[in-house]
């Protein structure tokens, strides 16, 4: 099992102390590290494979290729990977081919920003944005200006997006909120002395023909909202989410339950973090150490001083609009296989779910128990951190 989710504890705990909203994508971090590992060797590669829970680079690349294939199969899912290379470097052919085949990465040779006479970044260079995606849609361009120092030679860029689910009503695709989800359900838990409630919202998946896919081949996305009973229970809840194996998916409600009243505030915010410091604390320090990093499998003409990762930043955004603030009732989960055929267990009494104090949320792929995003809301009125 990889350790990417543990970065959320270091960054998320700081955000709680600062009373800030927070969101983090372990999936996007894993994608970036997996691509970087393709160009690593020696102790650097060993550390990265151990951190990502893979025995060999071929296993890691196969996993990345499988995820990319799934992302490309569904129009709701978007994944982008770009490698920006200074003109002075030439990437190894094997690195470029693996980056494209297993990670969806495409590269561009460009002149990265240089400092002017006052030390500021030269603004003459145009903004660059590369995407490897299944279809072509208008997209926002991201500039490198102000983000890249004069000594930078390679920039990796990753982007993943799970936009709001959509339904097809004959007049085109329109965004939908949790009211249009396939089913909603909730449950109450007690874990290591901490009581909390979980609200689960499943969403429809629409195929490229515009039809809702109910088949077993469709990914099954849902949002889980974790509400601690105690107002100050968020930090304890976050610690369990990142340290207990499969905690998030183990807390998925599985019993039939009515949830009323059920209210979640609308919120919209983004947060960013420099993952390098957190990764070093977790034992992945070699790629960020100028004296220890070994990225010799990336470029043919690696500089004498070598290459290392100076910064690894991640910025995520989330929005739950007014359409999704109130769920009237919970729907039902499938019958538990522990019951004999024909027997229906007694329905528990209704559960209220009113998120009026800090809560945690996760966006997961239910079938594969994969956490795509993990975050918390301290103040829903704050938009950007």
From Swiss-Prot:
Q: Which GO terms describe its molecular function?
A: serine-type endopeptidase inhibitor activity
**Family membership noted in the UniProt record:** Belongs to the serpin family.
Q: Which GO terms describe its cellular component?
A: extracellular space
Comment, domains: The reactive center loop (RCL) extends out from the body of the protein and directs binding to the target protease. The protease cleaves the serpin at the reactive site within the RCL, establishing a covalent linkage between the carboxyl group of the serpin reactive site and the serine hydroxyl of the protease. The resulting inactive serpin-protease complex is highly stable.
Site-annotated residues for Reactive bond? 338-339
Gene3D superfamilies assigned: Alpha-1-antitrypsin, domain 1, Antithrombin, subunit I, domain 2
Report the domain of life of the source organism. Answer: Eukaryota
Q: What is this protein called?
A: Putative non-inhibitory serpin-Z11
